[in-house]
């Protein structure tokens, strides 16, 4: 199962499905609703996807793949200091959340709706993303930049970042860069006291 596909039409269908899954929830979304939202007949949907599960997997895979790609790029382009790397990861995560919001919300709240085969297939992407965070947090811990248990620190950081999809206003005064800077500042300040 490799649901990442470069077809522009398929990408648009995935984007529309993500929006509908966020609005209605995966369980309440029917194939007929998806087809209507996408402007196609129900049967035509199966030209692109085997079933609704594959659509969900495609939404989550594309969102997670994009997050992983952006995070790797941010780390490759930032400096070597733990502070810069922590900031780059936070900024990349926020940019992913805020530019690909629906796919991320679906990944956060509908992971449990994936069947076992899809979860197994997608776990490598999620694990790779979490490993990047753990590595950056380990570097910050080793440098004394932050303190705490790596598992707990990573869960608190991810939770704080992920919650921004609920309250952040892209039209507001704060930009993703501001949020990333503030998060890292709070983490570093708490270790200094």
Predicted ranges, named:
Residues 12, 16, 20-54, 58:
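Helix-turn-helix
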Residues 98-117, 166:
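Amphipathic alpha-helical segments used for helix-helix packing
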Residues 62-72, 117-142, 151-155, 178-181:
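Amphipathic alpha-helical packing segments from all-alpha helical-bundle domains
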Residues 92-95, 99, 130-139, 158-160, ...:
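C-terminal peripheral helix-coil segments that are non-catalytic and often amphipathic
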Residues 10-11, 31, 53, 57, ...:
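Short, structured helix-loop boundary elements
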Residues 58, 73-102, 153-157:
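Hydrophobic alpha-helical connector segments
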Residues 23-24, 78, 100, 143:
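Short coil/turn segments at alpha/beta junctions that flank glycine-rich nucleotide-binding fingerprints
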Residues 26-27, 146, 174:
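Conserved hydrophobic residue
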